[in-house]
Amino acid sequence: MGQKVVAMLDFLLAYSDYSKDFRPLIIDQPEDNLDNRYIYRHLVQQFRDVKAQRQIILATHNATIVTNSMTDQVVIMESDGVNGWIESQGYVSEKYIKNHIINQLEGGKDSFKHKMSIYETALSE
């Protein structure tokens, strides 16, 4: 399934070059069936390149995409199962948005701190 996702995303992201169609592109959960290494090494760069030509609106649960794709705006959505609303919005550089990213995409501060403590020795080498 991942190869199909990669092929479709490559097509969608390259399409505007050939068609001269620069309308906004809306993609729901592009990370589905893709590993984080591929997302970081390839997909993030594709988003960076394409956003110079057209607006990209993503719905994602992936912190790698949000924090590495040079996001212009982060919109945090909430829902009660019936209605959806904007909980918060801002830039990745803003502390309250970073807190939302940690809480929503990393599982909360305790989860993120635990993850960092596990990775700490690998990162210090």
UniProtKB/Swiss-Prot annotation:
It comes from the Bacteria. This is Uncharacterized protein SP_1053. Induction: In S.pneumoniae strain 0100993 is found in the pezT/SP_1052/SP_1053 operon. Disruption phenotype: Strains with a pezT/SP_1052/SP_1053 disruption have partially attenuated virulence, they take longer to develop a terminal infection in mice, although they grow normally in liquid culture. A double SP_1052/SP_1053 disruption grows almost as well as wild-type, showing the effect is mostly due to disruption of pezT.
